[in-house]
Each structure stands twice: as structure tokens, then as C-alpha cells.
Amino acid sequence: MVPELQKSTVRIQQPERVMGVIRAIKEQGCSKLQVISDFDMTLSRFGCNGRRCPTSHNILDNSHVISEDGKKKLKDLLHHYYPIEIDPNRTLEEKRPLMVEWWTRAHELLSQQKIQKGDIAQIVRESDVMLRDGFNELFDQLHKYSVPMFIFSAGVGDVLEEIIRQANVFYPNVNVVSNYMDFDDSGVLKCFKSPLIHTYNKNNSVLQGTAYFQQLSTRTSIILLGDSMGDLTMADGVPSVENILKIGFLNDKVEEQRGRYLDAYDIVLESDETLDVVNGILRYILMET
């Protein structure tokens, strides 16, 4: 059915159930399908040539528009909060307020840097960001079959949209909900628009998605792509779900997180920098039989 599922990076706890879901989504047809995806480290690569690839926040943090002092403070925040974000021994309840604190402090620091709206394209061009191998096929196929793609990101929307734009895949079927910058009349960043989206509130509490999902109420088959426990709630705004396939990229601390990911995601991709498996499943689902 889907030869890509034989890749060595693939782990599936319940293969029969997963194949059943994939078959059911195919039977429902592409008019019933929508894709809901995280962006950073899901559509973009986690690592390349042994180095970490940047997230949409990192792209700003590391860019020429941030002062040395600003860079140091942002790095300090990362070193303090990132271990908390991925700590398997803390509950989501413990993590949530700390993530709000991190994002708020980072956005306040960025807002002091006088970032110009016109600089963002250049900042993205100069960065090391890479989309996962196979991104062209993913975006092209979804566009060709008019399958809506909802990108739900705790990153920076302005940066993320620019990455997709520069990759020439920002098609009309792609919708983004993320943290967007608010510029003053002269195009200088003054703050970020609310609501704040962090790793662990990607759910109904962020209301921008709900109107979107209402319009797509007939699309009851969902493929969800994520890389964190916080991404599992991204489809919570969908009014009725008949079939959902959750695919998780396990990028970091693979050994210690494997058990939790296998329990939470239908398919887990370990240290896999490609979209091969996603594309293989879509090829099977979208193939006219």
C-alpha cells in the first residue's frame, strides 16, 4: 500500500489500526481531506549536516537586525526554557505558564530591536532554514487536489510565510495561524498581535482557527503533522472528525521520548529529515483508483 512505511525511521505501535485509518481516509476521498500541520521542525528541518536548523524565532534571533546584547538575552531565554519545554517529567499544566513567560519575554526583546517589515525577506534569505526534503511534492499535491492545508505555528507568522513564499509553495489552499508582528506606520515592529500562541496552547483557546474549521466542516478526514506533544491538540477546533491520522516527527532526545510519542502519535518518524512517509501516504490516498 505505502512502501515508505518500511523505512527504518518509521515506528508504529498499532500497524493494523493505522492501515485501517489510511484506507478509510482514501475511501472518503480527497474532497473530505484536510491537512493540519505544525511548521518549525515539522515542515522545516530539525538538523542539516550535523547542525541544528533554525526555527522561525531563531531566524530572527540570529539575524543581523538584532543587537549583540539582544542576541545574548534571547539565547539565555532559550537555554533556560527549552529544557523545560521538552522535559518528559513535567506536566503540561506546569509547562504552560512557563511557555507563556518565555514567549512573552522573547517577543518583548524582539520588539525593542526596531525590526523593519522590509527586512524580513532578507533575514530569511540569509538564514540557514531548510524545509524538509519532499516539501515541493507535499505542497504541490495538496494544491493540485485542492486539499486545504492549515499551518498552526507557535513561531513567527511573518517569517514563516516568507519561508514558504521564497520556496514558491505559498498556494491559495495554505492558511497560517501564528504569532504575527504588529508594525507601526513607518514599518517598524512595535509588538506582537494577540493571542499569543506557544507550544502548549495550540487548541480551541486560540480562536483564529475556529472560523476556518467551521468553513471546512465537511472535511472530516484529517492528517495531522507535528513534532511535539503540544501539536496533538491542533485539530481540536474541527467540528466533526471521522478519521484522523497523527504523524509525529521525533527529532530530539529520541530514546527517552520514544514511548510517549508512540503512545500519542499513530506514526512516529525518528530523526527523519524528509517528508517521504507523508508524501507516500498522500500518494496512496489521492491516487485515483
UniProtKB/Swiss-Prot annotation:
N(7)-methyl-GMP binds at E85. Keywords: Cytoplasm, Hydrolase, Magnesium, Metal-binding, Nucleotide metabolism, Nucleotide-binding. It holds the Pfam family UMPH-1. NCBIfam families: HAD-SF-IE (TIGR01544). CMP binds at E85. Belongs to the pyrimidine 5'-nucleotidase family. Specifically hydrolyzes 7-methylguanosine monophosphate (m(7)GMP) to 7-methylguanosine and inorganic phosphate. The specific activity for m(7)GMP may protect cells against undesired salvage of m(7)GMP and its incorporation into nucleic acids. Also has weak activity for CMP. UMP and purine nucleotides are poor substrates. One of its GO terms (cellular component) is cytoplasm. It comes from the Eukaryota. One of its GO terms (biological process) is nucleotide metabolic process. It catalyses: N(7)-methyl-GMP + H2O = N(7)-methylguanosine + phosphate; CMP + H2O = cytidine + phosphate; a ribonucleoside 5'-phosphate + H2O = a ribonucleoside + phosphate. This is 7-methylguanosine phosphate-specific 5'-nucleotidase. One of its GO terms (molecular function) is nucleotide binding. Mg(2+) binds at D38, D40, D227. It is found in: Cytoplasm. The active site is at D38, D40. InterPro entries: HAD-like_sf, HAD_sf, Pyrimidine_nucleotidase_eu. Gene3D superfamilies: HAD superfamily/HAD-like, Pyrimidine 5'-nucleotidase (UMPH-1), N-terminal domain. Signal peptide: none annotated. Its EC number is 3.1.3.91, 3.1.3.5. It is an enzyme of class 3 (hydrolase).
